[in-house]
Curated annotation (Swiss-Prot):
Protein's name according to its UniProt entry: Phosphoribosyl-AMP cyclohydrolase
Pfam families referenced in this protein's UniProt entry, alphabetically: PRA-CH
Binding residues annotated for Zn(2+), in chain numbering: C92, C108, C115
Pathway recorded for this protein: Amino-acid biosynthesis; L-histidine biosynthesis; L-histidine from 5-phospho-alpha-D-ribose 1-diphosphate: step 3/9
Gene3D superfamilies on file: Phosphoribosyl-AMP cyclohydrolase
EC annotation from Swiss-Prot or TrEMBL: 3.5.4.19
Localization annotation: Cytoplasm
Cofactor note: Binds 1 Mg(2+) ion per subunit. Binds 1 zinc ion per subunit.
GO molecular function terms attached to this record: magnesium ion binding; phosphoribosyl-AMP cyclohydrolase activity; zinc ion binding
Gene it is expressed from: hisI
Assigned keywords, A-Z: Amino-acid biosynthesis, Cytoplasm, Histidine biosynthesis, Hydrolase, Magnesium, Metal-binding, Zinc
Cofactor needs: Mg(2+); Zn(2+)
Record-linked InterPro entries: PRA-CH, PRib_AMP_CycHydrolase_dom, PRib_AMP_CycHydrolase_sf
Length: 147
């Protein structure tokens, strides 16, 4: 696995080749979309640095990089709700990663199955309004993540 800053492979090699050459951003991160392998539901969007991607590939469990905590984290390390990776894909220019996983428990730190539990609607005046959908909690986050 190489960083695009270290080398500049030809576009055709990136788009059509078989070498994994993730294109990390200036902060050393790549966006990762994680979906449920069975249902296809989007569970979360997070970021990976080179180490998180490598650990995910090697271990078969999802690892991410937290921008707010500035550290690597294994999904489920606190909650026990790990993600077993069934498939990893990269997009055409290798600047985004897609994980298809078997999710144990909830994916969201709020206790919900998915981090995408609010839909943008409009109120009577046309202003944006968030509507809760699929918002049932599978666990109480206060019991798992004490403050």
């Amino acid at each position: 696995m190489t960083s695009s800053a270290a080398s500049s492979p030809a576009l055709d090699d990136i788009e059509e080749g078989i070498a994994l050459r993730p294109k990390f951003d200036a902060a050393g991160l790549v966006t990762c979309v994680t979906t449920d392998a069975r249902s296809g539901e989007v569970l979360m969007v997070a970021h990976m640095n080179a180490e998180a991607l490598e650990k995910t590939v090697q271990s078969g469990e999802a690892w991410y990089y937290s921008r707010s905590r500035k550290r690597l984290w294994k999904k489920g390390e606190s909650s026990g709700h790990v993600q077993r990776v069934l498939e990893i894909r990269v997009d055409c220019d290798q600047d985004a990663v897609w994980l298809r996983v078997e999710q144990a428990g909830a994916a969201c730190h709020t206790g919900r199955q998915s981090c995408f539990y609010r839909r943008i609607d409009r109120d009577g005046s046309g202003a944006p309004l968030l509507t809760m959908v699929d918002a049932d909690r599978l666990f109480d986050p206060a019991k798992i993540y004490p403050k």
